[in-house]
């Protein structure tokens, strides 16, 4: 079974972005990249700084039918954007998109917060990220 939530963020206009991919049981991958194929992955120290709370618990399980509601709460510190020197999120302007990917399920599905105008599902397209501003603290 493979269900992933993804958070993509470009904190500046360099063309690079971070992608945070988290499974429904809290397994996490963090990469910094300009394109899908070439990424610099976060160190174990960065990975440990990201708190995860999966509603389904941390153990793998087979796909099942019925009530499939779940959530994963991530607490991502600004330092997790490890190629930047952020110390807080306050007032940061960035471009982001959020996704849900169930590509290896018996009924594959893909969702995004903002639409992606591509012929097939592809989340690694920063041109479809949306500008946001984090609240001032």
Description of each model-found segment:
Residues 4-137:
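Structural preference for beta-rich elements and adjacent junctions enriched in aromatics
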Residues 1:
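Phosphate/diphosphate ligand-binding glycine-rich loop within oxidoreductases
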